[in-house]
Amino acid sequence: MALRFEILHQSKKSRARVGRIETEHGCIDTPAFVPVATNGALKGVLDHSNIPLMFCNTYHLIVHPGAEAVAAMGGLHQFIGRNAPIITDSGGFQIFSLAYGSVAEEIKSCGKKKGENSIIKINDEGVWFKSYRDGRKLFLSPEVSVQAQKHLGADIIIPLDELLPFHTDPAYFQQSSQRTYAWEKRSLDYHLANPGYQSMYGVIHGGTFPDQRKLGCQFVEDLPFDGSAIGGSLGKNLRDIVGVVDVTTANLSIERPRHLLGIGDLPSIWATVGFGIDSFDSSYPTKAARHGMILTSQGSLKINNQRYASDLNPIEPGCACPACSQGISRAYLRHLFKVHEPNAGIWASIHNMHYMQKIMSKIREKILNDQL
């Protein structure tokens, strides 16, 4: 079945809402944090059964083991042992972010350009690029991308689009926007020829230009997408992100779920959830964990700091995650990081992922009580 979305409560204080997305492989309570499992695995997290929705990257799975190989093994759910919802992207994000830098990197660097060595050629047909793994020449078109996502079998899929960096000149911006929306229409047409249980979100572009964002909303709203995803360049700082999300959500109907692509750090979630965003994807908690950044209700702990060398408190007192429940202390976790023990990143990732789920539960409760 295609997804069903129900709004359970609309906040009286903001545009925030609590909802539920039903898919073939289970339900997602929203707003939800969606961790990124790049190669079909959450780095440092072995048990993802309590994660309501997981984001897998089509580009990396095309490169290895191959989308057809995954299909031959029963699809992504069976391949990775997950009986819960999965969302995949088109593959375009990785291709263009390898050339231009990711959205998060763009925000940090104000769009300083990276090399474009990975992209060989781009035109209206699609994009030719080199595999980061072995240098093979690969091709991705709307139809190729959607077929790959059909092979993978995710519950929610994304049409092919072109990710532009912040520094793009206006002339190419217009050309790219037209190409992106043509690609999205082709993606949707290919999907609808054999939708099965899968659903597709339309991606809204427009950079930081309100008029272009409104046009993007109109494009997605006029087509039978199952949900909306806010993508493209979101600016150079949190203020820009908030502005883009505000104007975009104000021009979307309330009936479809809304996803914010590539943004899922805590400051951004708190700043944008009030505009009616239903899901956020990011590798933020596991990446932070691998660098010794521990998320807690008292703020982030830089566990490598000397102050934790003799701290026998749990990572976070009162936390029910497996790491804290088993008595992993701050001093012990710091020791593991200092000696480069792989378990350090595992325990930290388990805690951070649990913390993110706890925060989303808190956010849903605040919305239900009209406090957010």
Swiss-Prot record:
GO BP term, example: queuosine biosynthetic process
Keyword Cell membrane: no
Pfam family, one: TGT
Needed co-factor(s): Zn(2+)
InterPro entries (alphabetical): TGT (IPR004803), TGT-like_sf (IPR036511), tRNA_ribo_trans-like (IPR002616)
Binding site for substrate: 89-93, 161, 232
Sequence positions that bind Zn(2+): 319, 321, 324, 351
Annotated region described as RNA binding, given as residue ranges: 262-268, 286-290
Keywords of this entry: Glycosyltransferase, Metal-binding, Queuosine biosynthesis, Transferase, tRNA processing, Zinc
Top-level division of the source organism's lineage: Bacteria
Enzyme Commission code(s) on record: 2.4.2.29
Pathway entry: tRNA modification; tRNA-queuosine biosynthesis
NCBIfam families tied to this protein: Q_tRNA_tgt, tgt_general
PANTHER family per the UniProt record, alphabetical: PTHR43468, TRNA-GUANOSINE(34) QUEUINE TRANSGLYCOSYLASE
Sequence similarity: Belongs to the queuine tRNA-ribosyltransferase family.
Protein name as it appears in the record: Queuine tRNA-ribosyltransferase
Origin species: Chlamydia muridarum (strain MoPn / Nigg)
Lineage, opening ranks: Bacteria, Pseudomonadati, Chlamydiota, Chlamydiia, Chlamydiales
Gene behind the chain: tgt
